[in-house]
Curated annotation (Swiss-Prot):
Tissue expression profile of the protein: Expressed by the venom gland.
Enzyme class: lyase
Name assigned to this protein: Dermonecrotic toxin LsaSicTox-alphaIB1aiv
Keyword Magnesium: yes
Catalysis: reaction(s): an N-(acyl)-sphingosylphosphocholine = an N-(acyl)-sphingosyl-1,3-cyclic phosphate + choline; an N-(acyl)-sphingosylphosphoethanolamine = an N-(acyl)-sphingosyl-1,3-cyclic phosphate + ethanolamine; a 1-acyl-sn-glycero-3-phosphocholine = a 1-acyl-sn-glycero-2,3-cyclic phosphate + choline; a 1-acyl-sn-glycero-3-phosphoethanolamine = a 1-acyl-sn-glycero-2,3-cyclic phosphate + ethanolamine
Family annotation (Pfam families): GDPD_2
InterPro entries linked: PLC-like_Pdiesterase_TIM-brl
Length: 273
């Protein structure tokens, strides 16, 4: 999965997919009542990027729905996965459940079209704080209450705080999550980060009793660091330059082992090294 980083304006969906992304990451900020409000990152952000592009969250979902609904004039067949980077740092811990509830209602209405031929992309809810695991509970219980529990088949999870792998496992246990787990590792492109924790995550994925289904690394903009991440066995790379990742994937060293995921590739299925 080539994951376009910080895609927060509708116009950027086309831009990143046209550069080779089959997945995008979108920042979601919340108001003080835990309503998802804007797709917005803010300053500071990655080096070389404009930090302030934004839409209202529900407006963005409308654009995203069009981009992932077959038959729509804006449809991109290859856009198959969306990571919502949920900026829950502005919330109190006890608001996490409400944030999950409100997020589910927004997606149900504006993305899934109440379950009637909505957008088809798989969704990863990426949460920065292990203490906010109840966001997952709120999300799940709301879709059940709204009589669309089947949509959870399209939803996966990530805790993005670079926490100890064992602590992440405990948070999933509390949330009752037993699959659909993406594990991120990384740092802003302005700084360097080694691959030690990525290798631990890959080892967990490849073990017989691990909780991780997929591992992705962020934010990778250079050919050398792309090769290092692929050599470590990641499933996804988040980038500001999808064309760079696509170029490296077409090198003879990688074409035998990797290909770009399509809609038929189940993002919750573990593919071991």
């Amino acid at each position: 999965w080539i994951m376009g980083h910080m895609v927060n304006a509708i116009a950027q969906i086309d831009e990143f997919v046209n550069l080779g992304a089959n997945s995008i990451e979108t920042d979601v900020s919340f108001d003080k009542n835990a309503n998802p409000e804007y797709t917005y990152h803010g300053i500071p952000c990655d080096c070389g990027r404009t930090c302030t592009k934004w839409e209202y969250f529900n407006t963005f979902l409308g654009g995203l729905r069009k981009a992932t609904t077959p038959g729509d004039s804006k449809y991109h067949e290859k856009l198959v996965l969306v990571v919502f980077d949920l900026k829950t740092g502005s919330l109190y811990d006890n608001q996490a459940y409400d944030a999950g509830t409100k997020l589910a209602k927004s997606l149900l209405q504006n993305y899934w079209n109440k379950g009637n031929k909505g957008g088809r992309a798989y969704i990863v809810l990426s949460i920065p704080n292990l203490d906010h695991y109840k966001l997952i509970t709120g999300f799940k219980e709301t879709l059940t209450k709204e009589e669309h529990p089947e949509l959870m088949d399209k939803v996966g999870y990530d805790f993005s705080g670079n926490d100890d792998i064992g602590d992440v496992a405990k948070a999933y246990k509390k949330a009752g999550v037993t699959g659909h787990v993406w594990q991120s590792d990384g740092i802003t492109n302005c700084l360097l980060r080694g691959l030690d924790r990525v290798r631990k995550a890959v080892a967990n994925r490849d073990s017989s009793n691990g909780y991780i289904n997929k591992v992705y690394y962020w934010t990778v903009d250079k050919r050398a660091s792309t090769r290092d991440a692929l050599d470590a066995g990641v499933d996804g790379i988040m980038t500001n330059y999808p064309d760079v990742i696509a170029d490296v994937l077409s090198e003879s060293a990688y074409t035998a082992k990797f290909r770009i995921a399509t809609y038929d590739d189940n993002p919750w299925e573990t593919f071991k090294n």
